[in-house]
Amino acid sequence: MVISLKNRNFLKLLDYTPAEIQHLIDLAIELKAAKKAGCEKQTLIGKNIALIFEKTSTRTRCAFEVAAFDQGAQVTYLGPSGSQIGHKESMKDTARVLGRMYDGIEYRGFGQHIVEELGEYAGVPVWNGLTDEFHPTQILADLMTMLEHAPGKTLPELSFAYLGDARNNMGNSLMVGAAKMGMDIRLIAPKSFWPDAALVAQCREIASVTGARITLTESVEDGVHGVDFLYTDVWVSMGEPKEAWAERVSLMTPYQVNQQVVNATGNPDVKFMHCLPAFHNEHTKVGREIEMAYGLKGLEVTEEVFESAGSMVFDEAENRMHTIKAVMVATLGD
């Protein structure tokens, strides 16, 4: 079956079929191999791409810029303070302006409705670099990384546990990705931090077709048993007030990924994943503040696990670029 994603938006995985998601992962694997072999074919020569960042970024910005440059495209970066978007000009108007000048637009910011509006009115492919609800490019990188570290297996044969704040964009997106690809996902969190019930129901409906297994539990021991991968994310997301830390640390400490949790999987080959940045020691400004306030040298993951041989976080980070490149090539490439 020939799959064409030409001129499609990439706003959330719910918009894509399992075959289309697998196609993007396979393309990313091919592009990664070609880059490393020095034989990458450029398909975005002469294309101009706008990168809208209403939230700061390291990995996402670098991944989009390097991917675009590798493929021969030019980029314009519009940072949090570098445009009139939402201040003097609506997103609907911005979309219609940028769509006349650019061949593709990336957006990283706040509500999902904003990137949906951008996608509706731009007239060119729009890609979601992160919203409060979803982070689809990260999930492509995660699924690619899982396949790389489970040779001979397909995604429906893999299981993973996500510990921590399961109601954030990563919890939402991992659940959607697992449902679409027929995987076994366990979301382990306090019940008040489970994903929205409507999204859970939607994912379970998808799972009834794909064979995915979706488990929501407060029990770490039950949830992690037998999984292939352990996944976590920060306990306080971008945009949440600093005052949320005290309550969050109290609620989430039992869900920290530490060696005890690794052992509880019963899988000597279990791998660790994190979308980054991670609070795993006191070597950052925030890390030092956390240590002083709560006496903790790591939050969602310990230094021991983060730096262990089973940690795939930097493979995962690299794969952000390859999967983002695949999205741009598939939707915009010649």
UniProtKB/Swiss-Prot annotation:
**GO CC field:** cytoplasm
Kindly list the positions annotated as binding carbamoyl phosphate.
Answer: 57-60, 84, 108, 135-138, 275-276, 320
Give any single GO term for biological process.
arginine biosynthetic process via ornithine
Pathway(s): Amino-acid degradation; L-arginine degradation via ADI pathway; carbamoyl phosphate from L-arginine: step 2/2
Q: What does the sequence similarity comment in the record state about its family?
A: Belongs to the aspartate/ornithine carbamoyltransferase superfamily. OTCase family.
Chain's role: Reversibly catalyzes the transfer of the carbamoyl group from carbamoyl phosphate (CP) to the N(epsilon) atom of ornithine (ORN) to produce L-citrulline.
Please identify the protein, giving its name as recorded: Ornithine carbamoyltransferase, catabolic
What organism is this sequence from? Salmonella typhi
This protein's encoding gene? arcB
